[in-house]
């Protein structure tokens, strides 16, 4: 989404005096900062190891944010519009700021070091990925990780390393000072990540930065959806940060699932994925890694993977030294909706029932937010198992219940009736009503069907990889969410093979090995606008002491998509870029379809500042 410049440039804004820079990309900071990390730096994807995306700096605040101006712009020129065999690029990186240098990754997986005050390039490293690869996410890289080798002296090469996991399945180590490969890591500075069962070039790739804890660098994987039943398994691997030696590996979905098979008349369990494609959080004090996982394959039919599919669609705490499971909590049982635990886990401490409780906060694409005790995995706010609609598809065995948190409230719509359909004209509304009336529609967790099912929310609804930020002074969690619905229909194998010229606009998934193929699309009117009522994107602040919404405002605008109906399009845009919060009382967020970055008042949600990125 967005215009071409969004895919290849970094824009930095600054107050005129004193000079203080703020990256345009969605950066993140921590709440309770580790004592050894200066507040001026941004050494992790989420600023601190727990991913709180909170800046303790106050130079930019509610009183002066309106004076922010562009300080400099750097063009990476790594742009693809998706022509020929090359996929479209997306510029989604979060830069790191360490030791006076800004490090960013590009859609082509180059790593670039910049002077943060001037934007001057210091060096660039090119892993030379296969740019025409069949990457399901397009050409995307969301950032890098850094590690300081305490065994090496200051000035020694590769004392500080930059780690990047690439789309063609490699882990590379780079000297932070020069941009040269760290030759003692793996073979010539890299380790191959393609040695997994079911590997398929392009379908198995990496988009998120590794996690670093102690002397380990840990990588998950992005695995394409809906190609076949037995996709590559979503293994998590920990490597020695100095040598690249594999220290341990963990599979979210075990190959042997005896209880699941017994509960479904001893069916053979066939599946893959369940992978950790998003960003992880680490807690060095507890020796824990917090891993968010996605759905098992294929996403929309689970007849060959009976049971809950643990630990897919979960947040799992692993012991960093061994990779052993400390605890796990599953957010969705037997997922049939692509409701991944897409958001990064966020680690903080909340005041609850008169006590300070260390927590991990985990959201998903269903728009549900779970608050768990970091030591035990037990819910801090109650979670109840509720009955959900059951499948009528032959061969499918649906979970009878799903876990619903009682607080915070759902952050995405869970129902849409035909009468509630939206459109800018009467003709649009009627077309949406007719489509919805023909679908199976029982609200959230209505399973895919042969007639077609309304997915509320759709698979980019709720919270995505962009995550949320936490302000410890106000105990407010801020997140952007999407309110978009979709249609999903299973097609019997013989009919799917014959679809040919009868194919509809939308996405098809082969789901090879399953008795059904998949058809899905976002539900839109003839004017190409969502059938769900606006706002289609909101920014919400949640009081995490009570688990209640503090404020909620529409985020961005989609008027540019309105054509002749532009003036009838309300505020609120689909967004795929998350917020940061500052001690100056400002929430910054970009990622909307109108190509703007905005600043909001943390206490009220009032928009204080806006600038375009194009």
Model-derived segments and spans:
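Short aromatic-glycine motifs in intrinsically disordered, low-complexity regions
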Residues: 52-60, 169-176, 456-457, 527-529, ...
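Mature N-terminal segment immediately following signal peptide/propeptide cleavage
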Residues: 30-79, 94-97, 539-540
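Long, low-complexity segments enriched in small/aliphatic residues
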Residues: 402, 407-486, 493-495, 538-541
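Bacterial N-terminal signal peptides that target proteins for export
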Residues: 2-13
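N-terminal pre-domain segments of enzymes
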Residues: 24-58, 399-429, 433, 499, ...
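Repeat-blade elements of multi-bladed beta-propeller folds
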Residues: 42-46, 88-108, 136-170, 202-228, ...
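Bacterial N-terminal signal peptides
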Residues: 13-23
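Extracytoplasmic/lumenal domain signature
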Residues: 66-79, 111-135, 148-153, 171-201, ...
């Amino acid at each position: 989404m967005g215009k071409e410049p969004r895919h290849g440039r970094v824009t930095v804004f600054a107050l005129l005096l004193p000079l203080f820079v703020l990256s345009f990309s969605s950066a993140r900071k921590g709440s309770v900062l580790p004592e050894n990390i200066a507040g001026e730096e941004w050494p992790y994807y989420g600023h601190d190891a727990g991913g709180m995306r909170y800046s303790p700096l106050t130079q930019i605040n509610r009183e002066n944010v309106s004076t922010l101006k562009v300080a400099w712009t750097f063009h990476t020129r790594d742009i693809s519009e998706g022509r020929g065999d090359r996929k479209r690029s997306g510029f989604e990186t979060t830069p790191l700021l360490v030791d006076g240098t800004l490090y960013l990754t590009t859609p082509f997986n180059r790593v670039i070091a910049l002077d943060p005050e001037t934007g001057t390039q210091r060096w660039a490293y090119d892993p030379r990925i296969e740019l025409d690869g069949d990457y399901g996410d397009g050409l995307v890289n969301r950032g890098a990780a850094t590690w300081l080798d305490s065994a090496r002296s200051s000035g020694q090469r590769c004392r500080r390393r930059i780690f990047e996991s690439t789309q063609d399945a490699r882990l590379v180590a780079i000297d932070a000072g020069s941009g040269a490969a760290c030759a003692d890591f793996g073979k010539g500075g890299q380790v191959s990540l393609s040695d997994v069962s079911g590997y398929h070039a392009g379908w198995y790739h990496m988009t998120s930065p590794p996690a670093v804890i102690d002397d380990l660098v840990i990588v998950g994987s992005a695995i394409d959806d809906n190609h076949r039943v037995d996709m590559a398994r979503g293994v998590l691997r920990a490597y020695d940060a100095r040598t690249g030696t594999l220290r341990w590996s963990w599979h979210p979905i075990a190959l042997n699932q005896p209880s699941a098979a017994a509960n479904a008349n001893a069916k053979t369990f066939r599946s893959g994925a369940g992978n950790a494609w998003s960003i992880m959080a680490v807690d060095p004090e507890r020796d824990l890694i917090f891993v968010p996982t996605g759905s098992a394959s294929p996403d929309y039919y689970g007849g060959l993977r009976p049971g809950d599919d643990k630990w897919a669609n979960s947040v799992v705490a692993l012991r960093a030294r061994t990779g052993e499971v400390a605890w796990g909590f599953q957010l969705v049982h037997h997922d049939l909706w692509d409701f991944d635990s897409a958001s990064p886990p966020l680690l903080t401490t909340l005041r609850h029932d008169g006590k300070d409780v260390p927590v991990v906060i985990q959201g998903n694409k269903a728009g549900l937010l779970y608050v768990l005790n970091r030591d035990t995995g037990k819910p801090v706010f109650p979670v109840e198992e509720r009955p959900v609609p059951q499948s009528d598809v032959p061969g499918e065995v649906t979970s009878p219940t799903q876990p619903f948190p009682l607080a915070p409230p759902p952050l995405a719509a869970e129902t849409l009736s035909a009468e509630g359909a939206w459109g800018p004209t009467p003709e649009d509304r009627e077309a949406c009503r007719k489509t919805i009336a023909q679908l199976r529609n029982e609200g959230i967790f209505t399973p895919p069907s042969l007639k077609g099912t309304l997915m509320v929310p759709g698979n980019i609804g709720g919270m995505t990889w962009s995550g949320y930020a936490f302000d410890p002074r106000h105990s407010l969690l801020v997140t952007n969410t999407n309110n978009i619905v979709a249609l999903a229909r299973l097609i019997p194998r013989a009919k799917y093979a014959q679809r040919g010229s009868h194919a509809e606009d939308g996405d098809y998934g082969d789901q090879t090995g399953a008795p059904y193929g998949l058809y899905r699309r976002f539900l839109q009117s003839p004017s190409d606008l969502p059938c769900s009522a606006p706002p289609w994107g909101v920014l919400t602040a949640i009081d995490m002491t009570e688990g209640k919404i503090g404020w909620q405002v529409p985020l961005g605008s989609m008027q540019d998509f309105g054509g002749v109906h532009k003036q009838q399009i309300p505020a609120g845009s689909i967004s795929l870029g998350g917020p940061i919060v500052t001690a100056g009382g400002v929430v910054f967020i970009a990622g909307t379809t109108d190509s703007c970055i905005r600043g909001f008042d943390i206490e009220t949600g009032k928009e204080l500042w806006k600038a375009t990125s194009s």
